[in-house]
């Protein structure tokens, strides 16, 4: 299994997380912590804390820590500032985040309850930009600008452990002769005749590394994660001793990377925040049994009805005694009142 298969923090939007899911995963770093932040869209009037990591934004209520939300950077479509109506601050400038997760759009509005502080905007926007500009660490890439003057263009925090000349890429019937790089974050190969014919495979995207027989003889076979397209890539490294040595080295580096991934999001605050575990309140189990059969209530307030081109037809509500816009499938008036209360 690739590291990516277990990674959800930057690729998902989740609500009402457990205390375990609120903790940082290996490779995740807390960059900033902002107290007195209101989740104006979903929990207006509720003072909370916003945590900015290299993978996601976390918000939790200070009064009830199980009221929380996690927004992965890979889900973010747009970040802007807008005027919002806060119960705690009135009309004020707020951070507006539009996201898309599994074809569903959510919007979030966060308001800093400390007047005159731009830190909410600068922190989130800067870290999200750092995430967007460091995708080479995390994404499987074909035909990218990897090589300059026959040398690998190293990423920050990247170190080359081995460079192997005369490696055949077995993606075609004849094979292509090229150069193979093994680093601490990825595998790179490029053709000698045309260095724009290349591939970059981060350890994050590698599902398996094996030696298999092919029509060219024994070859290194790398299978990528399903999220990257499930590629199976073959490389011919001679002699066999060098092939075995390379596979051993790649497996070793992949194991080290899996234990402590390098996601490449490099951003530091002048003031170091406390560890995430010290900032999130442990959820206390009480005697009240919570019915969790219906999960729509937790996130209904965040829906961004982006596909709605016009108002839905009015229908008569016997419960309210007046005409209302027809509700979307799966939602009830009772459920909406529960969110508001």
UniProtKB/Swiss-Prot annotation:
Q: Name one GO cellular component term.
A: ciliary basal body
**Assembly and oligomerization:** Part of BBSome complex, that contains BBS1, BBS2, BBS4, BBS5, BBS7, BBS8/TTC8, BBS9 and BBIP10. Binds to phosphoinositides. Interacts with CCDC28B. Interacts with SMO; the interaction is indicative for the association of SMO with the BBsome complex to facilitate ciliary localization of SMO. Interacts with PKD1. Interacts with DLEC1.
Protein's UniProt keywords contain Cell membrane: yes
Per UniProt, the keywords (alphabetical) are: Cell membrane, Cell projection, Cilium, Cilium biogenesis/degradation, Cytoplasm, Cytoskeleton, Membrane, Protein transport, Transport
Any one GO MF term held by the record is: phosphatidylinositol-3-phosphate binding
SMART domains in UniProt? DM16 (SM00683)
Compartment list:
Cell projection, Cilium membrane; Cytoplasm; Cytoplasm, Cytoskeleton, Cilium basal body; Cytoplasm, Cytoskeleton, Microtubule organizing center, Centrosome, Centriolar satellite
What highest taxon heads this organism's lineage?
Eukaryota
Q: What's the chief localization of this chain?
A: membrane
Functional description taken from the UniProt entry = The BBSome complex is thought to function as a coat complex required for sorting of specific membrane proteins to the primary cilia. The BBSome complex is required for ciliogenesis but is dispensable for centriolar satellite function. This ciliogenic function is mediated in part by the Rab8 GDP/GTP exchange factor, which localizes to the basal body and contacts the BBSome. Rab8(GTP) enters the primary cilium and promotes extension of the ciliary membrane.
Q: Name one GO biological process term.
A: cilium assembly
**What organism, scientifically named, is this protein from?**
Macaca fascicularis
Read off the InterPro entries from this record. BBL5 (IPR006606), BBS5/fem-3 (IPR030804), BBS5_PH (IPR014003), PH-like_dom_sf (IPR011993)
Specify whether Membrane is a keyword of the entry. Answer: yes
By what name is this protein known? BBSome complex member BBS5
Q: List, alphabetically, the Pfam families matched.
A: BBL5
Q: Which family does it belong to?
A: Belongs to the BBS5 family.
């Amino acid at each position: 299994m690739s590291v990516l298969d277990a990674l959800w923090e930057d690729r998902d939007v989740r609500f009402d997380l457990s205390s375990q899911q609120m903790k940082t995963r290996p490779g995740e770093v807390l960059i900033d912590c902002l107290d007195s932040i209101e989740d104006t869209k979903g929990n207006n009037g509720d003072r909370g804390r916003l945590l900015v990591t290299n993978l996601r934004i976390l918000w939790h209520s200070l009064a009830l820590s199980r009221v929380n939300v996690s927004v992965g950077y890979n889900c973010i479509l747009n970040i802007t500032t807008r005027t919002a109506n806060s119960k705690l601050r009135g009309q004020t400038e707020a951070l507006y985040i539009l996201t898309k997760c599994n074809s569903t759009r959510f919007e979030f509005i966060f308001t800093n309850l400390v007047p005159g502080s731009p830190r909410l905007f600068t922190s989130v926007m800067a870290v999200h930009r750092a995430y967007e500009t460091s995708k080479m660490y995390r994404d499987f890439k074909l035909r990218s600008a990897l090589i300059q003057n026959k040398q690998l263009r190293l990423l920050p925090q990247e170190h080359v452990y081995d460079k192997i000349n005369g490696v055949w890429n077995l993606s075609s019937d004849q094979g292509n002769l090229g150069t193979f790089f093994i680093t601490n974050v990825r595998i790179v190969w490029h053709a000698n005749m045309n260095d724009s014919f290349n591939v970059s495979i981060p350890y994050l995207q590698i599902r398996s590394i094996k030696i298999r027989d092919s029509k060219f003889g024994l070859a290194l076979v790398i299978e990528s994660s399903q999220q990257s397209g499930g590629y199976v890539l073959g490389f011919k490294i001679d002699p066999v001793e060098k092939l075995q040595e390379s596979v051993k080295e790649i497996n070793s580096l992949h194991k080290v990377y899996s234990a402590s991934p390098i996601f490449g999001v490099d951003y530091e605050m002048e003031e170091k925040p406390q560890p995430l575990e010290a900032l999130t309140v442990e959820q206390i189990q009480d005697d009240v049994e919570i019915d969790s059969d219906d999960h729509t209530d937790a996130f209904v307030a965040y829906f961004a009805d982006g596909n709605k081109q016009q108002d839905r037809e009015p229908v008569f509500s016997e419960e309210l005694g007046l005409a209302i816009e027809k509700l979307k499938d799966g939602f009830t008036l009772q459920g909406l009142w529960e969110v508001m209360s």
